[in-house]
């Protein structure tokens, strides 16, 4: 799915690409892959890295293109493992800014709605990255509460039964916590690397930066 947004006191959906708009692509088709690689000409290695479900948060620059990968939480269709985390890539150069995810997420669509409701401006590409990191921390917390509820239920069931299935259910749910903690740690390291980019230091919104640091 491909969507374009322009910044106007919040992110407003538009029909086609314009310079400096935000292009969001989720679960890219072959047509969208060709659009990214041939029309927008992002590095193919960046595309492949984002596609790797185990890719860690990081920042990389190649031929003027910047790739930033963060991890965000998503719901799973697996009843035993209800939540996990996925990589989201932000790729930008000049007038082009793209987010790419190979999984459908609640977070990105909610982020668009939130910016419109609160009239939030996106100043530049790094401002978008920081706001997405902040949004991800909110979703981690939201899902963490649900994980804790499921753990409590599994513990209660385990107290009532000594069946191996109940223990396995608890262990599986606790895996969600491991996924969350590993991804949050990776996002925190990513944030500190972004902070150390000399060319961007004077452009950062210090209040936003502090908010992200606190939430992560």
Regions found by a protein language model. Name each.
Residues 1-215:
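Peripheral, non-transmembrane regulatory/ligand-interaction domains of membrane transport proteins
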């Amino acid at each position: 799915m491909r969507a374009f947004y322009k910044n106007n006191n919040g992110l407003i959906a538009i029909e086609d690409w314009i310079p400096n708009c935000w292009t969001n692509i989720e679960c890219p088709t072959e047509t969208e892959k060709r659009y990214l690689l041939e029309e927008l000409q992002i590095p193919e290695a960046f595309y492949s890295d984002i596609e790797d479900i185990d890719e860690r948060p990081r920042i990389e620059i190649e031929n003027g293109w910047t790739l930033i990968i963060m991890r965000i939480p998503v719901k799973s269709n697996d009843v035993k493992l209800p939540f996990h985390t996925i990589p989201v890539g932000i790729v930008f150069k000049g007038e082009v800014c793209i987010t790419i995810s190979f999984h459908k997420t609640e977070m990105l669509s909610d982020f668009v709605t939130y910016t419109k409701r609160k009239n939030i401006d996106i100043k530049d590409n790094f401002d978008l990255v920081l706001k997405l990191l902040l949004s991800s921390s909110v979703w981690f917390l939201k899902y963490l509460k649900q994980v804790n509820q499921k753990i409590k239920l599994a513990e209660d069931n385990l107290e009532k039964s000594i069946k191996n299935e109940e223990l396995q259910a608890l262990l599986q749910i606790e895996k969600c916590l491991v996924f969350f903690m590993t991804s949050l740690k990776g996002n925190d390291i990513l944030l500190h690397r972004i902070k150390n980019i000399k060319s961007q230091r004077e452009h950062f919104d210090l209040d936003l930066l502090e908010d992200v640091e606190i939430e992560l």
